[in-house]
């Protein structure tokens, strides 16, 4: 996914191009199409001028999965979409397969009312600045505590390294935090 959950890393254009080349080589070698499925619900939540590379431009057999709930900052509203690159080898077949899978797996569609809300909100401008403010505050607290982390370039996650004195055991670290009512 891009930006990545849980690290907030944004994969660069070069990384996406490299992955596309590997997939093309695999397609040639196997005679089968491998799809690049990009889970991008956080693509609009980016920091410090970062941008999410447009995978459609680099690999024809790309599918984008995203979420209006994240795009429009509507937490809890489970409404999203799948977009198939029109340049892919067989976009209609892929769409049929996804539609079939949704029916067979019993996925529930978003209520009609909310589908209309999304249609009317398509061009809404969302202020994501609160995510950056929270990220920066949390990084300052972690810096002060001496806890290492991957600096998130996007999304609203911050992935920390378990402190040395816990020997890399995240379970022990979480239990320690819970004892001090830091983590529920």
What is each residue range found by the language model?
Residues 1-184:
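PLP-dependent class I/II
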């Amino acid at each position: 996914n891009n930006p990545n959950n849980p690290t907030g890393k944004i994969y660069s254009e070069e990384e996406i191009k490299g992955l596309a080349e590997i997939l093309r080589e695999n397609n040639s070698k196997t005679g089968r199409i491998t799809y690049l499925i990009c889970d991008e619900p956080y693509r609009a939540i980016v920091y410090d001028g970062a941008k999410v590379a447009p995978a459609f431009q680099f690999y024809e057999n790309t599918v984008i999965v995203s979420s209006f709930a994240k795009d429009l900052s509507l937490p809890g509203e489970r409404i999203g979409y799948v977009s198939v690159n029109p340049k892919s080898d067989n976009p209609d077949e892929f769409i049929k397969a996804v539609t079939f899978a949704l029916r067979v797996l019993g996925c529930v569609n978003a209520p009609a009312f909310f589908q209309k809300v999304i249609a009317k909100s398509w061009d809404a401008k969302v202020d994501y600045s609160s995510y950056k403010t929270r990220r920066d505050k949390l990084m300052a607290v972690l810096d002060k505590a001496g806890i290492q982390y991957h600096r998130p370039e996007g999304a609203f996650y911050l992935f920390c390294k378990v402190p040395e004195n816990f020997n890399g055991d995240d379970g022990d670290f979480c239990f320690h935090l819970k004892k001090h009512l830091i983590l529920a």
